């Protein structure tokens, strides 16, 4: 009997690596008609977990503001009150 690898968890491993290490996608697209360039698009996207993003200096202010807002909401006296 030979060992086999379960392929059903490959997507989970991929997402784990993507969130932990991150990825940068860059694309340049030029739309032409009859060899005449009409539209130029330059795209750049960074995909990663928030921990990785803040380690690289991305979304630091956004993360800090949302953490502060969340902390203020959870410690407010109205957060513990339930509606009947």
Curated annotation (Swiss-Prot):
GO MF annotation, one: structural molecule activity
Induction text: Probably part of a gvpF1-gvpG1-gvpH1-gvpI1-gvpJ1-gvpK1-gvpL1-gvpM1 operon, maximally expressed in early to mid log phase. Gas vesicles appear earlier when grown in static culture, possibly due to O(2)-limitation.
Region of interest called Beta-strand 2, as start-end residue ranges on this chain: 41-43
Subunit structure, as described in the record: GvpF to GvpM interact with each other in vitro, and may form multi-subunit complex(es). Might interact with GvpA1.
Physiological role: Proteins GvpF to GvpM might be involved in nucleating gas vesicle formation. A minor component of the gas vesicle. Gas vesicles are hollow, gas filled proteinaceous nanostructures found in several microbial planktonic microorganisms. They allow positioning of halobacteria at the optimal depth for growth in the poorly aerated, shallow brine pools of their habitat.
Domain notes: The N-terminus (residues 1-25) interacts with GvpL. A short motif conserved in GvpJ1/2 and GvpM1/2 (but not GvpA), which is predicted to be on the outer surface of the proteins, is important for the function of GvpJ and GvpM.
Note: Encoded in a 14-gene plasmid locus called p-vac which produces predominantly short, spindle-shaped gas vesicles during all stages of growth.
Protein name (record): Gas vesicle protein M1
Gene: gvpM11
